[in-house]
Amino acid sequence: MTLVYEKSSFVLIMAQIAEAQNIMTRSTSSNDLLSTSAGSPPSPTSAAILLSSSPSPTITIASLPSGLNIVSNPNGNPAINVVLLNVNLNKEEEKMTLGQLLACFPEVPSNIPIQLNPNQHKLRRDTIVSQPVITSKQSSLFETSKQSNIPLSASVTNLQTLNKEKENYNLLNSSTNSLHSLIITPPTSNNTSSNNFVGGNIINSSSEDSILPPPHIITTTTTTTTSLPPRSPMPLPSSNCINIPNNINIPDNISESSTCSLSSNASNNYPQSPPKYNNFEINQNNNNSISLSKSQSLDNILTNSNNNNNNEITISSNIPIPLPPQSSSPPPTRNNQSSPSPSSPQQQNIMPTPPSTSLTPPQSPTLSPSSSTHSTPTQTTTTIKLPPSSPPSTISQNNARKTQIPTTTTTTTTTTTTTSTTSTTSPNPVVNNKNLNTPSSSFSPTKRLTIAFGSLTRSSNTPPPESSIVPIRWEINLNQIKIASTSTSNTNTVSSQNLINSSNTNNNNNNNNNNNNNNNNNNNNNNNNNNNNNSGNNNNNNNNNNNNNNQLYEQYYKLCKGEFQQNTSLYNKTFNQLLDVDINTSLSLLDKCYDSILKSNGIGLLSSKDQYLSTQSKEKDPNRVKSLLSVVKNAVSEDILNVKPSKTMLYFSNFGKTIPINLEVIDECILNNFSSKKVKFKVLMGPPSKTHTINVSEKEGFIGKKSSITLNFSLILKSSIKLRRVVIIEIEGGVRYFILVQVESNKTAFGQPIEDSELVEDNTSFGPMLVPRALVILKQAFFGCNAHLTESIFRLPPANDSEYNIVKDRVNREAIGTTEPHCIATLIKVFFRELPNLLLNDIDPEIFLNFKPTAQSADTASSAATANSSSSGSGNGNSSPNNDDPTMDPVFIVNLIEEKRRSTFLWLVDLLAEVTKFESSNKMNSKSLSIIFSPNLYFAPSICSAENSFAISGKVVSFILELIQFNKSL
C-alpha cells in the first residue's frame, strides 16, 4: 500500500520519525555533507526518502528492504523518488493518523493509519491534557527492526553496535490518554560517515556500522489554528533560517476530504508530481543555528548556520493536533492534570548524547469526552516568541562543548462549536515552563505574545426552544362543552337514494325500540352487581378527588400570590382551569387561597388595628412595652397589603335566572382596603367577545388607606349563550383576585343545539327535511323581501345593527317585522355560526384531506382557502379528480353526518342552489356562496397543523360546491 501525505505534514513526519530512524547523520570527523550523484538510485539494501523538484505537494512512501537515506533529486526521477515502507494495516489503526500513533502509543505501532476514527469526534479536537507519565522501555523503538516486516520505515540496522551506556535513555515518552512531549534521542556511534553538499542537493549516506546523530537540536513550536480566511504570509526569515518555497499552498489541517490529503493509493507508488525544493543549503560552523519557518506558500529552502550562541531549529506550521485513540481511557480533566516532577528524565537538560528533537504540548483546558464537538475554521492565531534573557548551557558528551537549548512549548488555540450542554473553559494558550528552575537549568520564563484575529463562531449549544405556550381562555360557552362531551359517533348511513327520500326512518326507529327493550332487561340484571361495586369505587373516587383538589389548590395558591408570571405556560394552564373546573370547587379553593395568603402574612381577615389589639391582648408579659414600636411598624408595613373584594362571583342580580338578549344588566363589587397606606388596583377584562359585552366603571385607580371603592360591572348578551368568564383584579403589593362571571341568556333560536331546537318540516329539492323552526321563518322572510334578487346577498352586513339585534331576539317568538334583505341573510349565516357544534365538525379531518374534488371544484379550492380568514399557512387544494373511490363521493361524506344535522345541512345546500339560479341579479355564483358559508359550517380542530387546516378549508369549499351543483342537476 502506498501512503501519500501532504507536504505540510512532512515537517512533522521528519521531526518525529526521521530522527528516530537516523535519517540525518553527522560525521565525527568532518562538518561537510557527503553527496552522491543526483541521478543515482539508492542501493537495494537501503531506503530513501526523495525530495523531488516536481511541484507536486505530496510525497510517496513505499517499502524497501532496509536502510534509510534522504535523497534530493532536482530532476524528479520517479523511479528513485520513493521511500519504501512495509505497512501492515488493521481496522482499528487505519482510523488514526500517523501523528496520533506517534503521539499516543508507548510502543511502536504496527502500521500507519490513513484516516481518523469517526468516533474520535466525540472528543474535543482542541483538548490537550496532562503531561505524559508513561515511559516506554529503552529498546522499544529499535527492537522492532529485528522483525521481518518493518512497520514505520527501515529501522536502524546492526543494533548490537549501539553503546550499552546509551540504553538507559528514554527514547519515547508517550501516554495513551493524552498528548505528550516526544523526546527522541538517537544513539551515537564511533563509526564515521561522510556528508557532502553537491549542487544544492543533500545526500546523507549511512551504513549499518555508521549511526550518527544530527548536528542540531530541533525545538518545534506548533500553532494549530482554524481560520476561514487565508492567513497573511509571514515575513521572510533571515539568513539563519530555512526559507520554504512560496509557490506551494499548504493547508492548515490534514483531512481525508482535502485536495492534498492523507490518502491511500494502492495502484500508484509514486506521486503525480513530487514536491519542489529549489534550494537546500547547509553551512555548519562551530555553533549550529537552523530555523525553519513556514509561510502560507513555499518557494525556497535555505539553511544557514552562523557563529552565534544558539543551536536551534524552529518549525512553525499548522499541524493537526493528534488525538488519543478511541479505545483509550477518557482524558483527565483540568483538575486532575499532572505534570512530571523536575527530576523526571524527560526534564533533564543535561544531554549526554548529541542534540535531540523535542515536541512539548502545553497544558490546556479540557472537556468531558461525552460532549460532542467539531472544529470550525474561524480563528487564526500567531504566536511570537521572544528569546530568553539568560539562556542556559547544556553539556554535550559528543563534542564536549556547551550548547544553548532554549525552551519552547506548543501553544494550541482552536475554536470549536459544541453541540452538547457541557460547559467549556477558556481555550487561552498556556505556557509550559516545566524546564524552569530545575537543578541543572536556570531558565527565565519564556516571554510569549499571542495575537488572535478572525471572527468567532457562535456556539451551537443554544438552549432548546421552549414548548409552545397554551393559549389563555377568558370565556367559555357551557352549552358547547355539554355538546362536546355528549357527542357520539354516527353509525346510521344512507345511500344516495335515501339522501333524496328518507322514507326508511320509521323502520329504523322500530328496530331501535326493540333493541332498547333488550338493553333494559340486561341493565336490570346488572344493577345489583353494580350497586355492590359502587361503594368501593366511591371511596376510591373520593381519595382521587381529594388528591386532585390538593394539587389544584397549590396551583391556585401560586396563581393568586403572583408566583406565576403572566403569558407563561403555567399561568395559562392554571387560568384555564378556572373555567373548566366546577364553579363551586373553584370558588371554594379560591377563597381558601385568599385566606391562606393573608394569614401567612399575619393579616388574616382583621384590619391592622384589630390585629394590633389582638396581639396586645395575648401578651402576658407587662414589661414588653418596647415592642410597641415594632408592632406598629409591622402593622404599617405589611409584606402583602390587606385588600379584599366583597364578592368573588358576579351574578348580575339574576342568580338561577336567565338574562334577556340585548338587555344591559349591572352588578357591583366593593374593594375594601384594611391597610394603612394608599393602594393601587387594576382590573383586567380580557379581549372583547362576539357573544357579549362586559365593562367596568374604573379599570384602574387608587384606594385610600382604611377606605373602599365600588366597581360597577355591566353586561350585555348578544346571543343565546351560557357564559362563564373571568375578571382579574390586581392589587399592587397584594393578592391577585379572580372574579368569576356565570350567566345564562334566554333561550332563543340562536346558539342552541339543533337536537334541542324545535324542528319543523320544509320542502327542498332533496325532499321534505326536518329543520329548526327559526330557519323556516327566516327562509320565508328571505324570499318574501326578494332577498334572492339583491346584489351581493350573503356578502354585505345589515344596514342597521340595532334593527338586527331586535330581529334576532324576535325570531322564533313572533313576527320578525323587517324587510331588510341583508339583515335576514346575515341572521341565516349567524344561525349556523353560533351553533355550539358546527354542522360539519363531526367529520374526521382526514376525510376532508383525502377528499378529491372534481376539476371544476378543485379550481375553486385554492382561491377559497385564501379567502378563508380563519385559516393560516400555505396549502394547495388542487387535486386531480378521482371518482373511482366510493368513499370520496360527496354523498358518502354527507352520510357521515348525524341525521338531524344532515337534514339541516341539506336544507342550506338547497337554499344556496336556489340563490345561484338568480346569479344574473344578485351577482353571487356557487363558488362565492361556498366560500362565504364554509367557515360557518366547519372549523378545523386545533390538533391540525396550519398547513392541513388551510388545505381542509379548501376541500370544504369544494365539497359544498359539488353538492350545490348536484342539487341544481336534480
Swiss-Prot record:
InterPro entries: Rho_GTPase_activation_prot, RhoGAP_dom, RopGAP1-5. GO terms for cellular component: cytoplasm. Residues 30-49, 258-285, 312-446, 487-550, 860-886 are annotated as: Disordered. It is found in: Cytoplasm. It comes from the Eukaryota. Residues 754-970 form the Rho-GAP domain. The record marks 795 as: Arginine finger. Its main location: cytoplasm. Residues 392-406, 427-446 have a biased composition (Polar residues). Keywords: Cytoplasm, GTPase activation, Signal. GO terms for biological process: signal transduction. It holds the Pfam family RhoGAP. Residues 321-333 have a biased composition (Pro residues). SMART domains: RhoGAP (SM00324). Rho GTPase-activating protein involved in the signal transduction pathway. This is Rho GTPase-activating protein gacK.
